[in-house]
From Swiss-Prot:
Part of the 50S ribosomal subunit. One of two assembly initiator proteins, it binds directly to the 5'-end of the 23S rRNA, where it nucleates assembly of the 50S subunit. The gene is rplX. One of its GO terms (molecular function) is structural constituent of ribosome. It holds the Pfam family ribosomal_L24. This is Large ribosomal subunit protein uL24. InterPro entries: KOW, Rib_uL2_dom2, Ribosomal_uL24, Ribosomal_uL24_CS, Ribosomal_uL24_KOW, Translation_prot_SH3-like_sf. Belongs to the universal ribosomal protein uL24 family.
Amino acid sequence: MAAKIKKGDRVVILSGKDKGKHGEVTQALPQEGKVIVSGINIITRHRKPSQANPQGGLDRMEAPIAASKVAIEDPKTGKATRVRFDVRDGKKVRIAVKSGETING
């Protein structure tokens, strides 16, 4: 199946604690059905002091979020949209359903 969400896409979060926020996909994990979005689903890890990190402390990082909880941001309106595929100039391209605009990538 073709990838509807790819690295570099602008997405809107549909549900959860970050609902309504926008971000960019930094990593797609298609085998797991998850994506990592910049600034979304931030988790905190408590790190013990070690030789590599003598101070220890709190590490904040982005955790994967289910791909079903994000939607592509429409390039024209900035709202969530579904994606369909079409062949234009002999190439398969992704198209935003709401506006008909081509999605880069």
